[in-house]
Amino acid sequence: MKIDAKMSAWILPIHIYALLIPLILIPMIVQNESFLDGRIFQKHFFFYAVFFLMAGSLFEICQNHLDEWYVTDDSASGNGYSLFDGLFSFSILVGQCIILYGLIGNISLVKYLCLFLILIMPFIYYKKILPFLPLTIIGFANTISAYFLFEQVVIFLQFFSIALTVIFFNKLIQTENQFYHGLTTLCASSGIVFLYLAIELSANG
């Protein structure tokens, strides 16, 4: 099946938003350079994270195009799997790992955790053994680390956006109403906004 013009006008701009939203980190890093130097391990790693997060969104767009933007339980964009969908999940994981390393990479355990999750991700994705577990672990670690570094409760809205992502994705699979496709993408990609706000508020608030 294909989405109609009205649904296209809702879904496609949100995917462009998801592709471009990581770029908000770049001016924030430049403007708060000295602040970040005193708070986190390596600020320049955020630039690499932006690349991988955008690459992940691009792979997702490619897979959605192959699925004609109509997500079902059987489609690769839903609960199925494919090369592009796997690259999407892997790239997002790498981007999140790089953010965590940039925040607290001076802790040896963080390096080993990130390496371990990156190595096992392709296997558990292919086998469908808790495929969201690595992203859940690294997302939780990022949020908690950012809170202790920047002391801004706004960062906990990342948990809210994750919860909404799960709710809307499940509704999408159950109903095949593609309106939830847009909501899922919007919530899933907006977590980076709360990291941006936490750093801005901590540096300039």
What are these regions (language model features)?
Residues 15-28, 88-103, 137-145, 186-202:
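Hydrophobic cores of alpha-helical transmembrane segments in multi-pass inner/ER membrane proteins
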Residues 31-34, 62-70, 122-129, 167-176:
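Juxtamembrane "helix-exit" motif on the non-cytosolic side of transmembrane helices
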Residues 72-87, 132-138, 177-186:
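Non-cytosolic membrane-interface motifs at loop->transmembrane helix junctions
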